[in-house]
């Protein structure tokens, strides 16, 4: 089973896109460590945009890959601040429409 971790990137407070990406990647790494210790997620493979997208991808290309991975995952985990992120909202709506399990931080 797969669990897709959605965390805001563009909605972050850091001033440059590079800093936003670095901060979001650190956040995902921290979340993966926390989630891995949660018994609810013991059978899940954990993945996020940083597992399959290049840091220099266009936003459109990166989001298309993210949506693909939401569709092929069994569940989605929405991090703090997801409602302020267009990308996370798109991932949430995709998960909702396709009946995926949805977990919230």
What are these regions (language model features)?
Residues 1-105:
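Conserved catalytic or regulatory cores that recognize and/or transform ribose-phosphate-containing ligands
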């Amino acid at each position: 089973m797969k669990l897709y971790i959605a965390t805001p990137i563009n909605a972050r407070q850091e001033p440059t896109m590079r800093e936003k990406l670095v901060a979001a990647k650190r956040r995902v790494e921290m979340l993966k460590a926390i989630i891995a210790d949660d018994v609810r997620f013991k059978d899940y493979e954990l993945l996020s945009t940083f597992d399959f997208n290049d840091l220099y991808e266009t936003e459109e290309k990166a989001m298309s890959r993210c949506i693909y991975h939401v569709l092929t995952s069994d569940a989605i985990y929405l991090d703090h601040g997801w409602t302020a992120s267009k990308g996370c909202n798109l991932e949430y709506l995709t998960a909702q429409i396709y009946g995926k399990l949805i977990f919230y931080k």
